[in-house]
């Protein structure tokens, strides 16, 4: 993906979480990042009125769509499809260590 292509907009949940994360940290001191995210998910599911965040997300998506159209109109060629990566050149396998000469002699004698 080109570095100039506009970044995708955040979801309503992510907008809310970014603004609420510090308060969750204060309410749950010493929590791991995963615990904070889990608690954020619980709070989001319990949130009654999400319209503020959904409206912000809609506005950001509209701005994103406009920016993408401008990008593509100005010669942006990224279609959004991931490009196939070339496989790295195969590295030769490591050679097995040769047995020491004394071990080889012992094997020869035992036969």
Swiss-Prot record:
Region (Disordered): 72-111
DNA-binding region extent: 6-72
Record SUPFAM superfamilies: HMG-box
Compartmental location: Nucleus; Chromosome
Disulfide bond sites: none
Main subcellular location: nucleus
Listed Pfam families: HMG_box (PF00505)
Residue stretches of biased makeup (Acidic residues): 102-111
Modified residues (Phosphoserine): 11
InterPro entries: HMG_box_dom (IPR009071), HMG_box_dom_sf (IPR036910), HMGB (IPR050342)
GO cellular component, one term: nucleus
Highest taxon in the source lineage: Eukaryota
Listed CDD domains: HMG-box_SSRP1-like (cd21994)
Annotated keywords: Chromosome, DNA-binding, Nucleus, Phosphoprotein
GO molecular function: DNA binding, bending
Family label: Belongs to the HMGB family.
Protein name: High mobility group protein Z
Species annotation: Drosophila melanogaster
Lineage: Eukaryota, Metazoa, Ecdysozoa, Arthropoda, Hexapoda
Gene name, Swiss-Prot/TrEMBL: HmgZ
């Amino acid at each position: 993906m080109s570095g100039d292509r506009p970044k995708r907009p955040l979801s309503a949940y992510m907008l809310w979480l970014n603004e609420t994360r510090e308060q969750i940290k204060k309410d749950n001191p010493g929590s791991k990042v995963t615990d904070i995210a889990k608690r954020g998910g619980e709070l989001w599911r319990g949130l009654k009125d999400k319209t503020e965040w959904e409206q912000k997300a809609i506005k950001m998506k509209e701005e994103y769509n406009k920016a993408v159209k401008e990008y593509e109109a100005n010669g942006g060629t990224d279609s959004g499809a991931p490009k196939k990566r070339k496989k790295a050149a195969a590295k030769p396998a490591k050679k097995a260590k040769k047995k020491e000469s004394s071990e080889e002699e012992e094997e020869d004698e035992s036969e």
